[in-house]
Structures are given as C-alpha cells and as structure tokens.
Regions:
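Short, solvent-exposed polar/charged micro-motifs at secondary-structure junctions
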Residues: 47, 162-164, 189-195
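Rossmann-like dinucleotide/flavin-binding elements
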Residues: 1-28, 36-44, 54-162
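Short hydrophobic core segments
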Residues: 46-55, 210
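Phosphate/diphosphate-binding loops
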Residues: 58, 66, 176-210
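Short, aromatic/basic amphipathic alpha-helical patches
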Residues: 164-175
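A conserved beta-strand/loop element that lines the FAD pocket in flavoprotein oxidoreductases
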Residues: 30-38, 45, 173-186
Length: 210
C-alpha cells in the first residue's frame, strides 16, 4: 500500500497489520514485485552533516472521551475539517455537518488536544503548528462563508512566534472576525432535542460558560 500521498520515497510497502501472509502476496502479485528477501538492511555512511526530520504522528482524540470524538459525528479533527473544506472532499467544499448534512452556524476549534497535558496518552510539549493552522482554517471559513458562520478558537496560549505570525493573528481577529477565547473546554455534549453540540468551559474569571 501507499501509506499516504506524496510519500517519500514514493514507494509501496506491505501493511503487516492487515496482511502478514507474505507467501500469498507473492503468489497473487501479477507483476512479481514482492521480493521476500528484500528486507531491512543496515548501512554505514560517511557524511558531513545530519538533518533530523523524524516527522510526526497523528493524535487520536478518542483518548479524551470528554470531547466524544468518534461518538458525536460533528466532532472532527482539523484534518477531517480540511477534507470538508476541500473541493475534492466528501462534501465537495460545502460546509456541511457530517451528522445531518446541514450548514453549521457556529464552529469551535479546541486547541492543545493531545499536547501540553499530563494525562495518560498525552504529551507535555506544544505541537508548535496547531495555533497557525487553526487560525488559517477559521479565516478560510469566515472568508468563504462570511457572516453565516461564527468561528471561535479556544486556546491556552496563542503561540505565534514565527515571522509575521502575530500579524496573521491580528488579521484573523480584526479583518475576519475570528473570536478567541482563552480557555480549555472541559466537555462536548449533544443536546438531544436539537442535535446541537454544547461545549462547556471556564471563562477567564472562573465562571462556567456554555
């Protein structure tokens, strides 16, 4: 399989979690492209410098059951949301809720899901990318769908440390009307009578808000 588009190197590999019968794969492959003897090798290279580019893994939000990702269809990850916005995505770029196909009136981004936490399954450090792509997604949403959709980002700290990142943040607030709330939401629940999501969080002065 090709694990993801634009993989480097651009080569197919065997997904051992799905198929471990190598002999059967060799038998049915029409191009005779599977070579069982072509296994992992260790080589020693003499180089002048080393660049560390370990990549990253996606976090599974189901670890945090209070957000009910995987239970409530309208709770999605940023990657899921990018697919919704994409012209080649499941809704062909239309902003539609997975649960009922209707257009949402409010969208909330919850930052630091999986990072900067002490619970089991989380990491203690900042992912360093989420603030900027959340701002980008919120701005794209406001730009494409205008005043029809309210965009709110719930954050711990807006880490806009790169070149012109702070300017980008100011544009999101002042030009696009993106709302920023400094709070880490506690739970996401669904109102049974309406099917709408209800997000519970503490305001900056310690009050509970919905």
């Amino acid at each position: 399989c090709m694990r993801y588009p634009q993989a480097t190197p651009y080569a197919f590999s065997i997904d051992m979690e799905r198929c471990s019968n190598i002999d059967e794969l060799v038998r049915i492959c029409p191009a005779s492209a599977i070579l069982p003897e072509d296994t992992r090798k260790t080589r020693t290279l003499d180089v002048g410098s080393i660049i560390l580019a370990p990549g990253a893994d996606l976090f599974n939000p189901q670890v945090l059951d209070t957000y009910q990702y995987g239970v409530l269809p309208d709770v999605v990850t940023s990657l899921d949301y990018e697919r919704i916005l994409s012209a080649s995505g499941p809704t062909k770029g239309e902003l539609l809720r997975p649960s009922n196909g209707k257009s949402p009136k409010k969208i909330a981004w919850i930052q630091c899901v999986g990072s900067r936490g002490v619970q089991k399954g989380l990491v203690s450090y900042c992912s360093s990318a989420c603030c900027m792509y959340a701002l980008k997604e919120a701005m794209v949403t406001r730009e494409r769908f205008g005043g029809e959709v309210e965009a709110t980002i719930f954050y711990m700290d807006m880490r806009t440390a790169g070149k012109d990142y702070e300017t980008y943040l100011e544009r999101a607030k002042n030009e696009y009307g993106v709302r920023l709330v400094r709070s880490r939401p506690h739970t996401v629940e669904m109102e049974p009578s309406t099917g709408e999501l209800v997000l519970s969080y503490f305001t900056y002065d310690g009050k509970v808000a919905l």
